[in-house]
């Protein structure tokens, strides 16, 4: 979660993207570039991936992201980071710094700096080639 001022909350989990109709699988929290992003829940950093220079369009749109595995196997995902301050395998507690929000048009963030936060029911399924179902974060993160 961005620490400090959240200037607005964008599309929710049930919203579809304008133009493409793709589902939005998280919530966008807008805050100034460079704002510290903190862990919503305690867990273990499962992966830190930098998709900014990837050839895969989905990875490019995600930019730099961090996945934290929390209790019950759920994944908390933080996309559009300018830098990550954690490494894979690291344990984090709620409120620990994960990274910082990227500037606009960097790290797949679009026109305004924000962190895209999502909760997934489970980790990546190699057979389905997909992550677990998205869960509305407001029901999981109190």
Show which residues each predicted segment covers.
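Zn2+-dependent peptidoglycan hydrolase active-site motif and core
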Residues: 40-85, 109-116
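Surface-exposed, glycine-biased beta-strand/turn segments
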Residues: 1-65, 94, 103
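Acidic, glycine-rich catalytic/binding loops that coordinate metals and/or anionic ligands
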Residues: 1-2, 84-96, 113-142
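Short histidine-centered loop motifs in beta-beta connectors
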Residues: 32-33, 38-39, 72-95, 123-124
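Conserved beta-strand positions that form and line the central face of beta-propeller blades
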Residues: 28, 77, 100, 134-136
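Short alpha-helical segments in extracytoplasmic peptidoglycan/chitin-binding modules
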Residues: 18, 78, 98, 117
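A short, conserved strand-capping beta-turn/loop at the end of a beta strand
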Residues: 96-108
